[in-house]
Amino acid sequence: MEEELKSFVKVWGSAIISVSYCYYIPSKIKRGVHRLLSVLPVCVLFLVLPLFFVFTIFSSTTAFCLSILANFKLILFAFDKGPLLPLPTNLFRFICFTCLPIKLQTKPNSQNHLPKWVLPSKVAIFVLLLNIRSYKILLPPILLLGLYPLHLYIVLDVLLTIVNALLTIILRCDLEPHFNEPYLATSLQDFWGHRWNLMVSAIYRPGVYSPVRSVCQHQMRSDWARFMGCMTTFFVSGLIHELVYFYINREKPTLEVTWFFVLHGVCTAMEIAVKRKMQWSLSPMLLRLITVGFLVVTGDLLFFGQIERSNMLERRANEASLFIDFVKRKVFNYTVS
């Protein structure tokens, strides 16, 4: 554990120094290719940093924050786009907005109108899920089918909400939420575009979808340009998830996750085309059941297979236990001495 924490300090120390360089040097360079060339060495470094970890909790977090989000932010920053514009007022804020999964809130937060019991309920489910993993063998298959997606959503939502709350206090500004109750999605377009992982969606839109659509509009009809933008975005998302799985498992990619996102890209594009031709006549509740059901089934077939085979959730639980034991020993030794 001590070696892993030393690696953590070195990796994130390197990240902070690199982002500080981006704040002082590339920001003074004219936007475009020259600024892009000045940030590319940092992007390459961020792709390497997760490989210094053994623990999945550190490698996956670093991959998500640096290899994916920070790299996209810096590439968009090179062209005066993305969440780093306008340039934060000081270095500390620039480091936070670059390295952490946060985005300055630009619109009123609709989640403020949610009942007060929603967050405590999620925390209670989070605690329950931490304990129910020990009884996985005893659970019926139909329950296990929904356990992985529920676990993924609740863990991410609770932890990222806590991070947002702390950084809202530290930075003294309102931050965008990461999720907008995705279980209420009435379509795949609603789920991926407006409810699930909004931080990533806000980066994919200017970073992948809009450029591809803009280029394709000169070659084909606007409908096909939208389709190409949609498919490219989902394909890139699939490759990025394959990269994260590689950082965690250090195994050859299976492309299962890529096919999951390609499938959802096709289905989302078809859904958008159908909605343009006709109006939905189904009730919102039925649409939610169909949408969530499709996500759960396809996720079980293509998305969560690698997680289950690699025992990632169990490994993370063991890593958390090791970390807690390490802290207890250090505190005990400190109090005794």
From Swiss-Prot:
Got a GO cellular component term for this one?
A: membrane
Q: Which UniProt keywords apply?
A: Acyltransferase, Lipid biosynthesis, Lipid metabolism, Membrane, Transferase, Transmembrane, Transmembrane helix
EC numbers on record: 2.3.1.75
Main EC class of this protein? transferase
User: Which one Pfam family would you cite for this protein?
Assistant: MBOAT_2
Cited InterPro entries:
Wax_synthase, Wax_synthase_dom, Wax_synthase_Magnoliopsida
* Reactions mediated catalytically: a long chain fatty alcohol + a fatty acyl-CoA = a wax ester + CoA
Q: Which GO terms describe its biological process?
A: lipid metabolic process
Q: Where in the cell is it found?
A: Membrane
GO terms (molecular function) for this protein are: long-chain-alcohol O-fatty-acyltransferase activity
Its membrane topology: Multi-pass membrane protein
The function of this protein is:
Catalyzes the final step in the synthesis of long-chain linear esters (waxes).
**What name does this protein carry?**
Putative long-chain-alcohol O-fatty-acyltransferase 10
